Design a protein with these regions (language model features):
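Glyoxalase I/VOC metalloenzyme domain signal
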Residues: 1-7, 13-33, 48-106, 122-195
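Short acidic/glycine-enriched loop/turn segments that link adjacent beta-strands
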Residues: 38-42, 113-117
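Catalytic micro-motifs at enzyme active sites that drive phosphoryl/nucleotidyl and oxygen chemistry
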Residues: 106-110, 118-119
Length: 195
C-alpha cells in the first residue's frame, strides 16, 4: 500500500482568473503559491495549508456553473458536490462567515455536523464550497465513526484498507527503468519567479 500524505491539489476551471484570485486569495485568505502559463492557458495554485493546493485552469469561454445546493442529489452525469476547506478554529469560521457576508456572497449560518462545524457558500465560478472547523472532542482519524444504518459489504469490512480485492503487482517497474518526463509545471524550476 502506498503511504498517502493527504490531497496534493484539486484542479478546477475558471473563465475569470482575476475574480478567482480576488476571492480565494483576498477574501478567503489562501496565499497564491504558484502560477504558470500564458493568457488563455494559465494555471494558478493557492495554498490550503499542509502541502495541499487549490488549482485553477483559466480557460476562455468557461462560464460559472449553475449553483446547486450542497449535498442534494442530482441525476445524470455529475462529478462532484462541493469543495470543503478546513479552518483552524470556530473564530476563523465566524470571521470568514462575516467576511463573505460583507462582500455580498450568500453564506449559510454555521451548521453542527457532529465532527465539524461548517458554513456554505459559492465562489465566483459557482463552485459550491464549505468551510469547516473541527469539533475538538471528535477525532475521526484516530476514532472512525461508521454509523450507516445499511452499509454495503465493502463498508462492513471496516475503515482500514483490505487486501485481496485487486490483483497483485506482478511486474513492477524496476528502479533502473523508472523515468519522469517533463510536464508544464517544469517551468516552476526552469523559469525565474516574478516575485
Amino acid at each position: 500500500m502506498p503511504s498517502c500524505t493527504g490531497f496534493n491539489h484539486l484542479a478546477l476551471a475558471t473563465g475569470d482568473l482575476e475574480a478567482t484570485i480576488r476571492f480565494w486569495r483576498d477574501l478567503v485568505g489562501l496565499p497564491l503559491a504558484a502560477s504558470l502559463g500564458k493568457p488563455g492557458a494559465r494555471q494558478y495554485f493557492f495554498s490550503a495549508g499542509n502541502g495541499a493546493y487549490l488549482g485553477f485552469f483559466e480557460w476562455p469561454g468557461v462560464e460559472p456553473i449553475p449553483e446547486k445546493d450542497h449535498g442534494y442529489p442530482v441525476q445524470g452525469p455529475f462529478g462532484g458536490d462541493h469543495l470543503a476547506i478546513g479552518l483552524a478554529s470556530p473564530e476563523d469560521l465566524w470571521a470568514l462567515r462575516d467576511a463573505l457576508d460583507a462582500a455580498g456572497f450568500w453564506v449559510s449560518e454555521p451548521l453542527d455536523h457532529g465532527f465539524i462545524h461548517s458554513i456554505y457558500s459559492f465562489d465566483p465560478n459557482g463552485i459550491a464550497i464549505e468551510f469547516s472547523c473541527p469539533v475538538p472532542e471528535v477525532d475521526l482519524e484516530t476514532q472512525p465513526r461508521l454509523v450507516d444504518r445499511d452499509p454495503g459489504p465493502a463498508a462492513l469490512e471496516g475503515p482500514q484498507p483490505q487486501p485481496g480485492h485487486w490483483p497483485p503487482v506482478t511486474e513492477p517497474v524496476q528502479p533502473e527503468d523508472r523515468r519522469v518526463y517533463p510536464g508544464e509545471g517544469r517551468a516552476f524550476i526552469d523559469q525565474p519567479s516574478r516575485v
